[in-house]
A protein has these predicted regions:
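Short acidic helix/loop segment immediately C-terminal to the autophosphorylated histidine
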Residues: 16-23
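Short alpha-helical segment of the dimerization/phosphotransfer core of two-component systems
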Residues: 11, 34-42
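Short conserved segment of the HATPase_c
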Residues: 145-157
Length: 202
C-alpha cells in the first residue's frame, strides 16, 4: 500500500501548489481521483484474497450455469469495453454447462479475466470468450507476453515489465484461488494466432 499512498500524497501536494493555476489544479485533482480509485481497488483485492485464503472449503454452494454466468459477465463489462472501443465476442459452443460452486465467486473469477483482457487490449480490438463442454477461454488481441513473464503470471503482485495500464498484480491471483476452491484449473498462455489467453477447465 505504500506506493499508491505515496502517490496520493504527491498528487495532493501538486494540487495545493496549483491553486493559482486552474488547468494545473484540475489535472492534479483528476490524477488524485484516479489514484484514489487505484488504492481502493488494491484494498478491495487484498481483502478478497485474505477472505479466500481463510477458506478451506466452500459453503452455500449451488449449481451454476456457466453459459449464463459468462453472458451476465459480458453484459456487465460491455460499457467498460465500449469506452475503449473493444468488442466482446461470446462464443457458446456448449449449453447447459453446470458446475457446483458459489455464484458470486465464480462471477468474480470471470469478471477479473474480462477486466484483465480489456485492460491490456489495444483500442479497437476484440476480446473473445469461448465456452466448450469442459472449459472456457478468454483471449485478447494484445501483444502477448514474454516466456519469462508467462512463467510468473498469477503470482501475487507480479506484473510483466513494460505494462502501461494501471494494475496491482492481484487479479489473476484471485482467479487462481477461486478456481482452486471450485476444483478448476487455470492455464495462461500466448494464443497461437496472437494475444494472451486464459483457459479455465474442470
Amino acid at each position: 500500500l505504500r506506493s499508491p499512498l505515496a502517490a496520493l500524497k504527491v498528487q495532493t501536494d501538486v494540487a495545493q501548489l496549483s491553486m493559482d493555476d486552474a488547468e494545473g489544479r484540475e489535472k492534479a485533482l483528476a490524477q488524485l481521483h484516479q489514484g484514489i480509485d487505484r488504492a481502493t481497488r488494491l484494498v478491495d483485492q487484498l481483502l478478497t484474497l485474505s477472505r479466500l485464503d481463510s477458506l478451506a472449503q466452500l459453503d452455500d454452494v449451488q449449481p451454476v450455469a456457466i453459459d449464463d454466468l459468462l453472458q451476465s459477465a459480458v453484459m456487465e463489462m460491455y460499457h467498460h469495453a465500449q469506452q475503449s472501443a473493444i468488442e466482446l465476442r461470446l462464443h457458446l459452443n456448449a449449453s447447459h454447462i453446470v458446475h457446483t460452486g458459489q455464484p458470486l465467486l465464480l462471477s468474480l473469477l470471470v469478471r477479473n479475466l474480462l477486466d484483465n483482457a480489456v485492460r491490456y487490449s489495444p483500442r479497437g480490438s476484440q476480446v473473445d470468450i469461448t465456452l466448450n463442454a469442459r472449459e472456457f477461454r478468454v483471449r485478447d488481441n494484445g501483444p502477448g507476453i514474454s516466456p519469462q513473464a508467462l512463467a510468473r503470471i498469477g503470482e501475487r503482485f507480479y506484473r510483466p515489465p513494460g505494462q502501461d495500464a494501471p494494475g496491482s498484480g492481484l487479479g489473476l491471483s484471485i482467479v487462481r484461488r477461486i478456481a482452486s476452491l471450485h476444483g478448476m484449473q487455470v492455464d495462461f498462455a500466448n494464443a497461437r494466432d496472437g494475444g494472451f489467453e486464459a483457459r479455465v477447465y474442470w
